[in-house]
């Protein structure tokens, strides 16, 4: 089903043109910018404001690193990281996404107010998560595919048919949400690049995004920014220096139908999309 609007809390986000989700990591150990914006809330808020100036349509705020092999973070620590920033950005009048896989963090944030989207790498598998979101009238949801858990997901991931298996998993998660009373227009899906996938799995998924979107019937949100696949493709070992490859991958995703791209390098991505569209490429 073709859909051109994502119901996301206070906003109906138009998907007729690709949207940019800017990443605000409040973690000391994220793979790319860990510790850069987690020192204090004011540093993080200044970064978030800069992302909006550069062209971000959505801010995605997270307090737990889900990189491969990431250390455990308690729910108390995760909430302590995100709460002061969420409390401030809630009044900015822009779509705010919370990147979390814990029901308790979702519940606290939704009670705080001003949170429009729950972006969950675990696809609402935490106990009570689906029921919590079903009780919300309009909160947007992004369900992501991951094989395994962050601590072990990159240890020899295997698939018989990566596109088919990812599609079936995401369809099943979306179906559970709808059965619980969540409206389909609130749902987007993320195939989970580099979450329990080899480089070849990631390449195959990217090349077959149109089939994945057709099979699932939902808009796709794609996150490839600065990830290991970009490093493997370009030979760049420094995650922070993978911006050029990340922009190219974001454009490749959009060209294949992705509606939202989650990125660190907002200005470069926004400029690339503007130039590409102006030069007559059908996005």
Curated annotation (Swiss-Prot):
Q: What is the effect of changing residue 137 to T?
A: In strain: BT054
Domain of life, per lineage: Bacteria
Pathway(s) this gene product operates in, as recorded in its UniProt entry: Cofactor biosynthesis; tetrahydrofolate biosynthesis; 7,8-dihydrofolate from 2-amino-4-hydroxy-6-hydroxymethyl-7,8-dihydropteridine diphosphate and 4-aminobenzoate: step 1/2
Kindly list the cofactors needed: Mg(2+)
Pfam families per the record? Pterin_bind
What general EC class does the enzyme of this chain belong to? transferase
Q: What is the effect of changing residue 68 to P?
A: In strain: BT054
Binding residues for (7,8-dihydropterin-6-yl)methyl diphosphate: 66, 99, 119, 190, 227, 262-264
Please give the catalytic activity noted in the UniProt record: (7,8-dihydropterin-6-yl)methyl diphosphate + 4-aminobenzoate = 7,8-dihydropteroate + diphosphate
The reported effect of residue 241 to E is:
In strain: MO124
Q: Impact of mutating residue 151 to E?
A: In strain: BT054
Q: What happens when you mutate residue 174 to S? A: In strain: MO124
Q: Altering residue 275 to V: what's the impact?
A: In strain: BT054 and MO124
User: Which effect does the record note for changing residue 178 to V?
Assistant: In strain: BT054
The record's section on InterPro entries has: DHP_synth-like, DHP_synth_dom, Dihydropteroate_synth-like_sf, Pterin-binding_dom
State the Gene Ontology terms under molecular function: dihydropteroate synthase activity; metal ion binding
Changing residue 228 to R has the effect of: In strain: BT054
Q: What is the effect of changing residue 125 to T?
A: In strain: BT054
Residue sites binding Mg(2+) per the record: 25
Q: What is the effect of changing residue 198 to P?
A: In strain: MO124
What does the record give as the function of this protein?
Catalyzes the condensation of para-aminobenzoate (pABA) with 6-hydroxymethyl-7,8-dihydropterin diphosphate (DHPt-PP) to form 7,8-dihydropteroate (H2Pte), the immediate precursor of folate derivatives.
Family under the similarity heading: Belongs to the DHPS family.
Subunit organization: Homodimer.
Q: What is this protein called?
A: Dihydropteroate synthase
Q: Which organism encodes this protein?
A: Neisseria meningitidis serogroup C
The taxonomic lineage of its organism, from the top, reads: Bacteria, Pseudomonadati, Pseudomonadota, Betaproteobacteria, Neisseriales
Which gene underlies this protein? Answer: folP
């Amino acid at each position: 089903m073709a859909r051109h609007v994502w119901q996301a809390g206070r906003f109906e986000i138009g998907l007729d043109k690709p949207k940019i989700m800017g990443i605000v990591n409040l973690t000391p150990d994220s793979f790319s910018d860990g510790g850069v914006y987690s020192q204090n809330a004011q540093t993080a808020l200044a970064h978030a404001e800069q992302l909006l100036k550069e062209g971000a349509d959505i801010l995605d705020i997270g307090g737990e690193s889900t990189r491969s092999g990431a250390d455990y973070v308690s729910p108390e620590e995760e909430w302590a990281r995100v709460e002061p920033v969420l409390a401030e950005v809630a009044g900015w009048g822009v779509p705010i996404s919370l990147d979390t896989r814990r029901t308790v963090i979702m519940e606290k944030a939704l009670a705080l107010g001003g949170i429009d989207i729950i972006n969950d790498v675990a696809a609402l598998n935490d106990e009570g998560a689906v029921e919590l979101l079903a009780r919300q009238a309009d909160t947007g949801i992004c369900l992501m595919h991951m094989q395994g858990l962050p601590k072990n997901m990159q240890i020899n991931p295997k698939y018989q048919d990566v596109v088919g298996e990812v599609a079936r998993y995401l369809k099943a998660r979306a179906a559970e949400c709808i059965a619980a009373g969540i409206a389909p227009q609130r749902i987007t899906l993320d195939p989970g690049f580099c979450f329990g996938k080899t480089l070849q799995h990631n390449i195959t998924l990217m090349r077959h995004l149109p089939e994945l979107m057709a099979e699932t019937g939902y808009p796709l949100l794609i996150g490839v920014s600065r990830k290991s696949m970009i490093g493997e493709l370009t030979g760049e070992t420094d995650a922070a220096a993978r911006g050029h490859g990340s922009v190219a991958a974001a454009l490749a995703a959009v060209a294949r139908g992705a509606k939202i791209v989650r990125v660190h390098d907002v200005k470069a991505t926004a400029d690339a999309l503007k130039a590409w569209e102006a030069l007559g490429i059908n996005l």
